[in-house]
Every structure is written in C-alpha cells, then in structure tokens.
Curated annotation (Swiss-Prot):
Its main location: secreted. GO terms for biological process: cellular response to hypoxia; response to hypoxia. GO terms for cellular component: apoplast; Golgi apparatus; plant-type cell wall. Coiled coil: none annotated. Pfam families: Phi_1. It comes from Arabidopsis thaliana. This is Protein EXORDIUM-like 1. May play a role in a brassinosteroid-dependent regulatory pathway that controls growth and development under low carbon and energy availability. Keywords: Apoplast, Secreted, Signal. The keyword Signal applies. Disruption phenotype: No visible phenotype under normal growth conditions, but mutant plants show diminished biomass production under low carbon and energy conditions.
Length: 309
C-alpha cells in the first residue's frame, strides 16, 4: 500500500513572510477544508520510540507532555492554561465535522521503546523512520519516533523538523498505522527547529526566549511534536483537514507556524507567561508541574489561529 508522509516545515524564513497573514482574522481560510477522509478516533495510545541517546530527564519532558493530553488525567489539571485546554481546539474539528459516531478521540501514553545502540546507524532515511515506527503497536496507536541530537535524518534541517505519515500495517491486508517523527535540533539547526528558544536563521533577530524545561532541544521537540499530534489527529491519512495542495498542505498546526500568543508578529512569539524562578517562557501547564510552550492551532470554527490568552 502506498504510504502518506507529510513533513512539518518550521523554516522561519517562510514563517516570517507568512506570519502576518496567518494571524489576521480577516484572512481567507475558505480553502481549509475537510476532504472526507478518516480522523483518529477511539482510545489511542501514543507509543514513544527513542532512537539514540536521551537522558531520563529528557525523556520525562516528552512523556509528561503526552500524559498531559490524556482525557483521563484532565481532572487533575485544574490550573489553566493547561495542555488539555490547548488540545480542545483539536476537538473542535470533530464537532465541526458533525461526526455521526459518538466516538471521539482519547489519547494516553503507551509503551516506550529505547534504541540506544543506533540499530540503523546515525544517518536515517524515510524508510528507516517507517521501520522504526513499525516497532510500536499498530492497533489504535500512533507511534512517535524521536531521534537524538547526533542523528541525521533525510530532509532534517533542510526542509523539515519532523513529519507524520502512515505505514503498511502488519495485520490484515490493507491495514495501515499512523506515525510521527521529530528530531532533536539542538546541535544541528536550533534556529530553524527550536525557535523561539534560539535565534532564527533568517528574519528579525530578537533575543531568544528561555526554554521552560531548560533544554532548548527537547523544548523545541515538544513544540514540533504538539503540532504534529494535532495534524495526525485531524489528517492522519492525507485526506482529512488541510488547506492547499495535498503534497504540501497546511494543517491544524502548520497553518499557524510561529504563533504562540496574542500579538505575535515576525520575530515575536506573542504574549506569554514567564516563570518567576527560571525565567522560562511558556503558555500552558502540564502534569508534574511541567510548563510548555505550545504552538497556536488553526480553529475551524473561527477561521483563525487560536491562542490561549
């Protein structure tokens, strides 16, 4: 079966040129359409496949984020703005579609697979990513491949910071599974894939923000993972919600690249909260006292980029 792969472009030369138009509520988003395909539904596990060297503290940054998305844990997150509140924009796509089924989407942290021995080497192709993703469970799951800072990936830093797509399942004929890949850009291209925690390669050179978890690479990965999670939920197989050509669409997260808070403009992420102790900038809170900076998502009901405050 032919597979679908969509790279998540976070090249800020493009983002800076487009940001003003994307944050303008008068912008015409009528081409942001539902293309009659499936959305993710049901109880879905997020399996994490760690490729390369990650410290336990680094893995915890991501696992706490994924766990914060879980609907079963939302009652423990009374403080707003929260990761769960941010995810509610994704839920609007299900309401907007007027789904006939009562099944929505419930996410939970699934299994974790550690590949610290670089079983496929330190230079990966798209096929390698799919093979790694296939190691996770394929039933009601999204398999997330996370590559460490010393691993190069085809297209990484040149035209993408991560991607989502589908692979052929190992079950019945015609089955397929969704996967995500995100790379740690800290030593390779932080100005492209970890802004605003690093000065951008192009555009206005405002001082970088302090990463909320004191890890430019991992906090940048969370930004990209969050956007790709939203895209995977609303366009898992390439025929869900998106704007523009199918080969290079704008999706729920990528339609709002570079927007994190109200008042954003090229070189400025927008109005954010700042931790009084660490100086880290953030816009949501998660489990275990975590704070994250998450991207604005495209709101299908208001036809605009939705920020939390």
């Amino acid at each position: 079966m032919a597979s679908f792969v969509m790279g998540y472009f976070l090249l800020f030369a493009v983002a800076f040129m487009c940001l003003d138009a994307r944050t303008d509520k008068t912008q015409d988003y009528t081409s942001f359409q539902y293309h009659k395909g499936a959305l993710l539904t049901g109880d879905v596990s997020i399996n994490l496949i760690w490729y390369g060297k990650f410290k336990p503290s680094q893995r915890a940054i991501v696992t706490d984020f994924v766990a914060s998305l879980s609907s079963s844990r939302r009652s423990t997150m009374a403080q707003n703005p929260s990761v769960a509140t941010w995810w509610k924009t994704v839920e609007k796509y299900y309401q907007f579609r007027k789904m006939t089924t009562t099944r929505g989407l419930s996410l939970s942290l699934g299994e974790q697979i550690l590949d610290q021995g670089y079983s496929m080497g330190k230079s990966l192709t798209e096929k390698n990513l799919k093979d790694l993703a296939a190691k996770g469970g394929q039933s009601y799951a999204v398999n997330v491949v996370l590559t460490s800072a010393d691993v190069t990936v085809q297209g990484f830093c040149m035209n993408r910071c991560g991607s989502h797509g589908t692979g052929s399942g190992s079950g019945k004929k015609g089955s397929r599974f969704a996967y995500i890949w995100v790379g740690n850009s800290e030593t390779q291209c932080p100005g492209q894939c970890a802004w605003p925690f690093h000065a951008p390669v192009y555009g206005p050179q405002s001082p970088p923000l302090v990463a909320p978890n004191n890890d430019v690479g991992l906090d940048g990965m969370v930004i990209n993972l969050a956007s790709l999670m939203a895209a995977t939920a609303t366009n898992p197989f390439g025929d869900g919600y998106y704007q523009g050509p199918k080969t290079a669409p704008l999706e729920a997260g990528s339609a709002c690249t570079g927007v994190y808070g109200k008042g954003s403009y090229p070189g400025y992420a927008g109005e954010l909260l700042v931790d009084a102790t660490t100086g880290g900038s953030y816009n949501v809170k998660g489990l275990n006292g975590r704070k994250y900076l998450l991207p604005a998502l495209f709101d299908p009901k208001t036809d605009s980029c939705s920020t939390l405050f």
